[in-house]
Amino acid sequence: MNILADALLPGLDSAFPPPFTVTLYHKADEIPELLHYKDVLLCRSTLKINGDLLKNHQIKFVATATSGTDHIDFPFLESQNISIIDAKGCNAISVADYVVACLAYLDKQQLIQGKTAGIIGLGQVGTKVYERLNAAEFQLCLYDPPKATRDTSFQSCSLEDLFECDLLCVHAELHSDAPYPSLNLINRDFLKELKPGCIIINASRGGIVNEEALLHLGSAILYCTDVYNNEPHIDSRIVSKATLCTPHIAGHSLEAKFAAVAIVSRKLHQMLGLPYPQFATPEKPYRLNENSDWRELALSIYNPIHETLELKHAGNLSSAFLTLRKNHHHRHDFTTYFDSDSIKKYPLLG
């Protein structure tokens, strides 16, 4: 079975041994020619999967090595009987680490006003963030009405409950499905109800926060974001306004990248009735000196202010966004820097 895969994905050789044959693409414009006689297209969320890309090709599977699937035209793929494989949950730990790194920076700058936090979206990522904040004794409001309709053991808070929060963490999937669409959920009416000094950390999708409404908001809201409308052609005004702004890398730890490939591989092997291969894993990092507080430890692993300043000072914002995102490949999950006993001392770190 022939696979065309994004060259930036790690561990492909071990994840797809014979009977698979893997061909790599480095740029999207290489795909139309390379896709001939391929059975599987294995991509990242940066690639738009639609009829324009796949016309005149006979692939059987589209596999995305990411949790999000809003870059995929599901109706088109279904009309062509193309199966879709995703890697949901692969980066949940990595995104939770990112949120903690943002909190570490904000806390050092004395910008966190209180410990009442709202989490919007309680999927695998939001649940990991909940576990961290709950262990650190935040008072939590959990907002996910669709989950409440599916899971009777879960009770969602109301939108009005979120207005009393000092911190909002956005982890919902982007969708427009009634009665609870996430598209433009955080709009003008929502924003004007927030407490002055409220912090929004958006590590989900740009379309959930209405950027125009945010830009025209009169009150002092601190916006920290990893995601934007129209990536990579992001709005320079949002970059200027944001307290922290990073190039869509919250889920990009080394462990998350390897996990994404492994999840896709397992699903494909299972669908084809093949035994699982042995998967590659990243090398473990050095151990950290634990004679520091949680903020220093988190920021020694990843400090979001560095990429923030790179974006804020960029001449060509789109180019800087893509370059920074591509070069973000040295961060490990926080827990890999500690042994299991040590991590218990730092509940926010894992």
UniProtKB/Swiss-Prot annotation:
Keywords recorded for this protein, A-Z: Cytoplasm, NAD, Oxidoreductase, Pyridoxine biosynthesis
Annotated positions binding NAD(+): Q124, V125, D144, A203, S204, R205, D226, G251
Biochemical pathway: Cofactor biosynthesis; pyridoxine 5'-phosphate biosynthesis; pyridoxine 5'-phosphate from D-erythrose 4-phosphate: step 2/5
Reactions catalysed: 4-phospho-D-erythronate + NAD(+) = (R)-3-hydroxy-2-oxo-4-phosphooxybutanoate + NADH + H(+)
Function: Catalyzes the oxidation of erythronate-4-phosphate to 3-hydroxy-2-oxo-4-phosphonooxybutanoate.
HAMAP family attached to this UniProt entry: PdxB
Similarity field: Belongs to the D-isomer specific 2-hydroxyacid dehydrogenase family. PdxB subfamily.
Full protein name: Erythronate-4-phosphate dehydrogenase
Organism: Legionella pneumophila subsp. pneumophila (strain Philadelphia 1 / ATCC 33152 / DSM 7513)
Taxonomic lineage: Bacteria, Pseudomonadati, Pseudomonadota, Gammaproteobacteria, Legionellales
